[in-house]
């Protein structure tokens, strides 16, 4: 078959606008270019009839109708704007017009000074210096709404309102004067002590002796308990030191030698101080007073002091073996050192036991507490002469 040629579609029709002058062509050139673009777009979207000639198309021949192009509102606005192309929206921006500086001469300054002197109003004009931008600062009053509106200058400081944050994070209003201790700002008065004595059950003059008396009684009770435990432990240790073999005794006693020695030192010191309180001798004159010495012997104060002093020295002499067992565990102590330790240990047990027996026979031989009580009664006579009030004061002081 001879080759067949496809029909060439006709070129798009163009609307040629004739103008009499070249200036009109330049104005409408842009408009015609836009119309040509729109017309080409429409023609390309139209589907024309296919020729009956034989061709190698895949799809069969179908007649189709041409579909017109639907214009949108935006395109219509463009066409209307193209028709009125002579009207344009122009934006005009005016720059800042520089103002020439005024040149002042000496004559102008003199004239202004003359007018200011002749001004009949007499009002003084406030002259403000220009702020230096490098030093000027802006301070924002952030807490303006947070402050109390009644916080005036003439209001007393104690009546001002402050805001205190609570444990839940919220603030509550409180007066500033609540946190002031007004007693510090009051002038001292002579009648303050008398008023305090009248308000208190125990007079101020008797508070210190009463506290000393109660402290002495508590210490005496604690010392009695410690002396009882010390006597039992020291006797038990003395029995073990003679009944056990040296190797077994030293092996078991090695790890607790220093703690036991420290405990014995504390207990014997407490017992010795308690024995000094029983003697009633606190001044140099008491050693030459026959009455004091007789009372000390009668209360077992002097004998108790000697016993506890010997026990404290015996405890100090035991440190030689106990320190060697603690700091030199590989070194075997000599037999003489072990024998001396046993002797001192027995002496320590005897003194602690004898001191506890002397205390058991006379548990109320606390001379210090008795003298404090007598001093309180003497001061009580100076405070008041009312027997009922004396009884109330003594009951409150727990004497």
Swiss-Prot record:
GO biological process assignments: cilium assembly; non-motile cilium assembly
Sequence ranges of Pro residues compositional bias: 1-11
Membrane topology: Multi-pass membrane protein
Segments passing through the bilayer: 222-242, 256-276, 301-321, 343-363
Keyword Flavoprotein in record: no
Region (Disordered): 1-158
Family matches, as InterPro entries: TMEM237
Location in the cell: Membrane; Cell projection, Cilium
Comp. bias (Basic and acidic residues): 36-45, 111-135, 144-158
Cellular component GO terms, alphabetical: ciliary basal body; ciliary transition zone; membrane
Pfam families per the UniProt record, alphabetical: TMEM237
Keyword Transmembrane: yes
Keywords noted in UniProt: Cell projection, Cilium, Cilium biogenesis/degradation, Membrane, Transmembrane, Transmembrane helix
PANTHER family xref list: TRANSMEMBRANE PROTEIN 237
Functional note: Component of the transition zone in primary cilia. Required for ciliogenesis.
Similarity comment text for this entry: Belongs to the TMEM237 family.
Full protein name: Transmembrane protein 237 homolog
Species per Swiss-Prot/TrEMBL record: Caenorhabditis elegans
Gene responsible for this protein: jbts-14
């Amino acid at each position: 078959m001879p080759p067949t040629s496809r029909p060439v579609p006709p070129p798009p029709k163009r609307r040629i606008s004739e103008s009499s002058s070249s200036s009109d062509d330049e104005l409408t050139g842009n408009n015609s270019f836009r119309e040509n673009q729109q017309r080409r777009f429409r023609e390309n979207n139209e589907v024309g009839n296919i020729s009956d000639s034989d061709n190698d198309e895949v799809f069969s021949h179908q007649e189709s109708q041409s579909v017109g192009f639907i214009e949108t509102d935006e395109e219509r606005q463009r066409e209307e704007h193209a028709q009125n192309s002579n009207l344009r929206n122009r934006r005009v921006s005016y720059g800042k017009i520089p103002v020439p500086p005024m040149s002042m001469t000496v004559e102008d300054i003199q004239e202004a000074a003359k007018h200011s002197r002749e001004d009949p109003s007499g009002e003084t004009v406030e002259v403000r210096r220009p702020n230096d931008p490098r030093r000027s600062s802006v301070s924002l009053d952030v807490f303006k709404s947070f402050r109390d509106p009644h916080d005036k200058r003439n209001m007393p400081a104690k009546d001002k309102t402050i805001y205190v944050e609570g444990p839940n994070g919220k603030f509550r209003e409180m007066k500033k004067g609540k946190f002031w201790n007004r007693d510090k700002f009051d002038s001292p008065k002579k009648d303050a002590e008398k008023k305090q004595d009248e308000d208190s059950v125990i007079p101020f003059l008797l508070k210190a002796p009463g506290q000393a008396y109660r402290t002495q009684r508590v210490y005496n009770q604690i010392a009695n308990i410690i002396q009882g435990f010390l006597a039992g432990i020291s006797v038990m240790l003395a029995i073990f030191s003679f009944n056990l073999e040296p190797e077994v005794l030293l092996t078991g006693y090695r790890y607790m030698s220093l703690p036991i020695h420290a405990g014995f030192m504390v207990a014997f010191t407490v017992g010795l101080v308690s024995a000094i309180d029983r003697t009633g001798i606190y001044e140099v004159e008491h050693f030459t007073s026959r009455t004091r010495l007789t009372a000390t012997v009668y209360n077992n104060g002097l004998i108790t002091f000697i016993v506890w002093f010997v026990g404290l020295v015996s405890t100090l002499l035991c440190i030689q073996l106990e320190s060697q067992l603690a700091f030199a565990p590989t070194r075997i102590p000599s037999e003489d050192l072990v024998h001396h330790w046993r002797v001192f240990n027995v002496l320590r047990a005897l003194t602690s036991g004898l001191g506890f027996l002397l205390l058991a026979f006379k548990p109320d031989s606390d001379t210090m507490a008795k003298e404090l009580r007598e001093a309180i009664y003497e001061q009580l006579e100076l405070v008041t002469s009312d027997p009922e009030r004396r009884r109330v004061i003594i009951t409150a002081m727990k004497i």
